[in-house]
C-alpha cells in the first residue's frame, strides 16, 4: 500500500513515476536526478511502446518496481514485476511512495489516479484526462490539497491563488500559445497535415499533447481541469492567446489586481514544483531576462476557427459524464487524423457530433464503470462520425453546438 509520509529515512521524497518514458516522465527523472538530496525514484511505469528508454531508466535509477501495461513488451524486457492492463494500478497500490507522478497519456490514467489518491500519497497530476474523465469521482477521492497540478497553466494558477483568499478571486485567466496555426482561417485548416500539427511553436511535448494543442482541444481540457481543481465557475474562467508562452496564467482579484506567473517555457519548473510542493527547487529552470527588450502579446481566442474550448465549456457546464465523452471522442478523432482518415477540422467536428447525441450522459457517475461506459459509448459514436466525416459537415456540426 502506498503511504504518504514525510519521506524516506534520509528525508528524501519517494517518487513513483507513471508514464516514465514520455515527455513529462523523462523530464521528471532529470529533475529527480539533479536533486538527489530531495527526491528518490521508487518505481517506474510505462505502456511499453518505448521499451529501450524504460530499460535505460531502470539501469540508471536501479529501481526494481516496474510496471509495463503491454504484456508482450514486458516479456521482452524480462524480470518485470507488474505486467498487463492493471499493472500500473497494482504498482501504485503496492509501492511505498510519498509522491505519485501520473504522466500517463489518455483516460487510461483514471484508475492509477484513484489508486494514488486512495493511498494518501500526493498526486502530481500531469494526466489531465483522468481528472477530466473522472471528474466527480476524482474530487470525492481526493483529500484537500492532495492533488498538485503539473500542467504549466494550473501550476501558475496555484501559485497566483496564494496571493489572496478564495472569496477575493474575481476570475482566472488561462493563457494559450495559439498553437502552430494561430491566425489561420478555417479554409487554411482543411489542408493541415499531421506533420504540421506536430510542430509546436514554443513547447516541447509528447505527440498527443502537441496535436491537442494545435486543435486547441488541450486548452479545452485545461478549462475543464481548472474548474475541477479550483472550484471556480466556468463563466469566471477566461482563455486568452499569448504567443510567447511566458505568462502561463493569471488570477484577477476583486480589487482589480491581476497576479501573473511568468517564466520561460520549460516544463521542468512546474514538474519540480509539483514533486516538492510547496517548496521550490532552486535552479529548476531559467529566469526571465528583463535586461533584454521583450514584447508580450495577448489577444482573444478565435472561437469560430478554433471552437474546441467552447465545446469543452459546454460539456463542463452540462456536467455528468459529458467531459468524459468530450475526451474520449477527441482521442478517437485525433487517432483518425494521424492515420489520415479525416481532416484536421474534423477532429473537433467529431467531438461536436458526439456531444450532440450525448444527452443520456449528463448524469454524474456513481462509479468508475459509469465513466468507462460513457467513454465506450463516445468512442463508438465517434467512429461512426469518423466514417462519414467530411470537412464541410464537420464545420456545420461545430457551428450548431458551440
Swiss-Prot record:
Annotated positions binding NADPH: 21-24, 47, 50, 127, 129, 206
UniProt KW keywords: Isoprene biosynthesis, Manganese, Metal-binding, NADP, Oxidoreductase
Pathways per UniProt: Isoprenoid biosynthesis; isopentenyl diphosphate biosynthesis via DXP pathway; isopentenyl diphosphate from 1-deoxy-D-xylulose 5-phosphate: step 1/6
Catalytic activity line of the entry: 2-C-methyl-D-erythritol 4-phosphate + NADP(+) = 1-deoxy-D-xylulose 5-phosphate + NADPH + H(+)
Keyword flag Metal-binding: yes
Gene Ontology biological-process entries: isopentenyl diphosphate biosynthetic process, methylerythritol 4-phosphate pathway involved in terpenoid biosynthetic process
EC numbers for this chain: 1.1.1.267
Molecular function terms from GO: 1-deoxy-D-xylulose-5-phosphate reductoisomerase activity; manganese ion binding; NADPH binding
Domain of life of the organism encoding this protein: Bacteria
Binding site for Mn(2+): 151, 153, 222
Residues binding 1-deoxy-D-xylulose 5-phosphate: 128, 152-153, 177, 200, 213, 218-219, 222
Coiled-coil residues: none
InterPro entries for the chain: DXP_reductoisomerase (IPR003821), DXP_reductoisomerase_C (IPR013644), DXP_reductoisomerase_N (IPR013512), DXPR_C (IPR026877), DXPR_C_sf (IPR036169), NAD(P)-bd_dom_sf (IPR036291)
Cofactor(s) demanded: Mg(2+); Mn(2+)
Enzyme class (EC, first level): oxidoreductase
Family: Belongs to the DXR family.
Role summary: Catalyzes the NADPH-dependent rearrangement and reduction of 1-deoxy-D-xylulose-5-phosphate (DXP) to 2-C-methyl-D-erythritol 4-phosphate (MEP).
Name of protein: 1-deoxy-D-xylulose 5-phosphate reductoisomerase
Organism: Mycobacterium marinum (strain ATCC BAA-535 / M)
Source organism phylogeny: Bacteria, Bacillati, Actinomycetota, Actinomycetes, Mycobacteriales
